[in-house]
């Protein structure tokens, strides 16, 4: 039907007859000559129809935006003054000799033009039009290249691409499951997988020592800019390996991805940072190292001060007091400071103290802050020295339980970095390693795994784990790119007794463990090899590589922030016949919109 994609028509095609197919992107009538911009996924091509061929010209006059056409003509150089170097085909045009309308289109709700600002709901309702835009074509094409690059690399490393079940058993993995009722087994449900975690471990026990899969996963959780109810991840598992093997594999993969897609050369070895250091310096387990701001502990300087907010947190074993210096921040108005104070309350902070350093050489007289009256001159000078304050700086303070300080001041660090244009350009990748095995749930005060309950502790002893669970470190690792967690993984537990110990510590008794994970515990008894793996978020990685602000921009048909699809109106009510067949009756309080 066609001989060329639009962008393939160039000066090498001069004087040749070509045929292209696509959409009418633009139609212009200049002095009795019709100019068409024909668009396909490769780009635009200008076609000219002259009035001498009356029959074809009459067809061209009928064309409107988004008509689907087949065009045949002779390629020629554009006249002087008509060259458009902004277009890949801007030095040539096609003199149309034939024209066929393959399909018509009414005036669309919006034109697939990258320069238009389009309401997001409208974009998703008419996603098939939105995807015609050049920017969306480029983003999804890059995503394809990313997946191809990943497959090529892992295939060369002797990995096997093995599919795992989509209809499986519900297991606790940190989020709510999407449940699928079974018609054959009334009253029972499958769960859509949050990840192939247990199946890939079982594959290691089955002798497939190198597995990967680019797989769909499902989590019924609240949505954010970088979350979707269904998402895609690169899932990897290896047997007879240690942490270093996994880290080197992923470093090699990312090095190739960045080189092939962005022509950026990454270092052979990425920097590593312990979880403890990341939280101490940045208040985050996924720090953006392009941001130069850091949190600085000052608890030892304010333990005996008269400012109770500082003193109580400084003397609390679970508390933390930090300073965050913003260079040249004295131009912040009172309203700006109040807004930042309001911002940190979103993350549990009760407020935001600050000191403006108007003139460092003037001592206390050169400082401005509501809290100065509660602090001794010695304490203030010690704080200024520790943060290396300069005239013109503003110092913000966080004092509370450590988890509140980390979350609120870490978020403030990010916000200040963006608001003040402090974020350096380029790419900053790092591994966050040496994670705690467990954390205490602040509500229930019970242990819960930092990653998942199949992660191996660094000490392979059930006795050591029981004696100091909150001090035990895990063989876990996260890969972070520019402040986004792109992936995470761990070495897994391969000894049944150690796995039972972990279950017991997080409140899963023997009966519950058998009901939910009996198949795994059985498999661990039959010669499970040491193994570990990682999962990388394809959506997030594609978002970063395309410089997008949301993963919805790199997913062909995404859900909205309410987990709905404006295009198909999903989710939708099930009919009574379907519900009856599945043995389901809706509770009276459930209504459908």
Curated annotation (Swiss-Prot):
Residues annotated to bind L-aspartate: 173, 219, 451, 492
Reaction(s) this enzyme catalyzes, per UniProt: tRNA(Asx) + L-aspartate + ATP = L-aspartyl-tRNA(Asx) + AMP + diphosphate
Pfam family, one: GAD
Cellular component terms per the entry's GO annotation: cytoplasm
Annotated site, Important for tRNA non-discrimination, chain positions: 30, 81
Major enzyme class: ligase
GO BP annotations listed: aspartyl-tRNA aminoacylation
Binding site for ATP: 219-221, 228, 485, 537-540
A Gene Ontology molecular function term of the record: aspartate-tRNA(Asn) ligase activity
Subunit structure: Homodimer.
Name of the featured protein: Aspartate--tRNA(Asp/Asn) ligase
Gene: aspS
């Amino acid at each position: 039907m066609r001989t060329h994609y639009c962008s393939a028509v160039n000066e090498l095609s001069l004087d040749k007859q070509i045929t292209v197919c696509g959409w009418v992107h633009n139609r212009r009538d200049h002095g009795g000559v019709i100019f068409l911009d024909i668009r396909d996924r490769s780009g635009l091509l200008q076609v000219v129809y002259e009035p001498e061929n009356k029959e074809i010209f009459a067809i061209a006059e009928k064309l409107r935006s988004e008509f689907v056409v087949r065009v045949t003509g002779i390629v020629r150089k554009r006249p002087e003054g008509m060259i458009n170097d902004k277009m890949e085909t801007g030095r040539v045009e096609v003199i149309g000799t034939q024209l066929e309308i393959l399909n018509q289109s009414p005036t669309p709700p919006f034109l697939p033009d990258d320069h238009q600002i389009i309401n997001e709901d409208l974009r998703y309702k008419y996603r098939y039009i939105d995807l015609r835009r050049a920017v969306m074509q480029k983003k999804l094409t890059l995503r394809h290249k990313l997946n191809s690059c990943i497959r090529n690399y892992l295939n060369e490393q002797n990995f096997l691409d093995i599919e795992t079940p989509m209809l499986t058993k519900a297991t606790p993995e940190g989020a709510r499951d999407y449940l699928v009722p079974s018609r054959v087994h009334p009253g029972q449900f499958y769960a859509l997988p949050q990840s192939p975690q247990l199946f890939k471990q079982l594959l290691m026990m089955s002798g497939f020592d190198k597995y990967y899969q680019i797989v769909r996963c499902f989590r019924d959780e609240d949505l954010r800019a970088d979350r979707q109810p269904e998402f895609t991840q690169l899932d990897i598992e290896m047997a007879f390996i240690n942490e270093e093997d996994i880290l080197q594999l992923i470093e090699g993969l990312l090095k190739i991805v960045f080189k092939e897609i962005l022509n950026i050369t990454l270092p052979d070895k990425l920097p590593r940072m312990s979880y403890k250091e990341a939280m101490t310096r940045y208040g985050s387990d996924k720090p953006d190292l392009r941001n130069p701001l850091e949190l600085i502990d000052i608890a030892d300087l304010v333990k005996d001060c008269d400012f109770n907010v500082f003193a109580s947190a400084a003397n609390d074993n679970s508390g933390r007091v930090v300073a965050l210096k913003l260079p040249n921040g004295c131009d912040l108005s009172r309203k700006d400071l109040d807004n930042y104070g309001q911002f940190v309350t979103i993350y549990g902070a009760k407020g935001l103290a600050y000191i403006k350093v108007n003139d460092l050489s003037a001592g206390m007289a050169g400082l401005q802050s509501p809290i100065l009256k509660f602090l001794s001159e010695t304490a203030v000078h010690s704080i200024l020295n520790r943060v290396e304050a300069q005239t013109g700086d503003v110092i913000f303070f966080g004092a509370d339980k450590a988890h509140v300080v980390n979350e609120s001041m870490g978020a403030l660090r990010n916000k200040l970095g963006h608001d003040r244009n402090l974020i350096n350009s380029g790419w900053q990748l790092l591994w966050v390693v040496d994670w705690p095995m467990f954390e205490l749930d602040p509500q229930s005060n019970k242990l819960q795994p930092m990653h998942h309950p199949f992660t191996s502790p660094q000490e392979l002893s059930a006795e050591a784990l029981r004696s100091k669970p909150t001090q035990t470190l895990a063989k876990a690792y996260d890969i972070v790119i520019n402040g986004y967690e792109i992936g995470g993984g761990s070495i897994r537990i391969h000894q049944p007794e150690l796995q039972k110990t972990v279950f017991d510590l997080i409140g899963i008794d023997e009966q519950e463990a058998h009901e939910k994970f009996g198949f795994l515990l059985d498999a661990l008894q039959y010669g499970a090899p040491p193994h570990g793996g990682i999962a990388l978020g394809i959506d997030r990685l594609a978002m970063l590589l395309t410089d997008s602000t949301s993963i919805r921009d790199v997913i062909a048909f995404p859900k909205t922030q309410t987990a709905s699809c404006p295009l198909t109106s999903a989710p939708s009510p099930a009919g009574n016949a379907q519900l009856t067949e599945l043995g389901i009756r809706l509770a009276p309080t459930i209504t459908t919109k």
